[in-house]
Amino acid sequence: RLVKAIKSGKMVSGVDVLGAKAWMRLVEGNDRPVARYDSSKFDLDYLIRHFFEFADNNDVKIDSIWWNFSEGNQATYRSKRLPSIDIPVFQRWIKDDIDIVQILLDETHQRGIEAFYSHRMNGGDNEGNGGQAIIPMKESHPEWLFTGNGGSKIWNFAIKEVRQYILENLTEIVENYDYDGLELNFAR
């Protein structure tokens, strides 16, 4: 239902899409979980143990994990639309056909925990911390952008083509991965 709702282009809430009742949640958010680690110093088993250490504690009662894998303009998986993220650990995994997005989704569901994909709508090249990624679509369509704080170039969602481009990127995610929901993070 989530894929159908996104493809329809209609604004719907998670409650509308999933037909659920409102409830209190205990959420663990993982903000760019792998990017901060030196991939040469651990293996996937270590990574999984590390990321689920908190959720695996029965006293905590986590019922959902929100995974933020990237800045939204680059892919941490093998994408047909987006360039691969410029973080070495992800580049290595993509090259080796290791889909960390699917692995962590499966690990989350195996624990009976809901998994949400958190997607930054405007990240990757506007954080103001140096070393920002080059985003090919922004380079080829400067007319789709406006200037944000510190001179960063931000998608202008008032432009139909920007909305369509982002919608197609989101559609790729929800068609390839069976997450329980999709968070659109407009804070960046």
Residue ranges and their predicted role:
Residues 64-68, 114-120, 181-185:
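Outer-envelope exported proteins of Gram-negative bacteria
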Residues 5-42, 91-106, 115-176:
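Active-site-adjacent "subsite" loops/lids of carbohydrate-active enzymes
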Residues 45-76, 176-181:
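Catalytic domains of carbohydrate-active enzymes, especially glycoside hydrolases
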Residues 68-91, 186-188:
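Glycine-rich, proline-tolerant flexible connector loops at the mouths of alpha/beta enzymes
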Residues 43-46, 84-86:
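Short, low-complexity, polar/charged sequence segments that are solvent-exposed and flexible
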Residues 55, 65, 108, 166, ...:
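Conserved, mostly hydrophobic/aromatic
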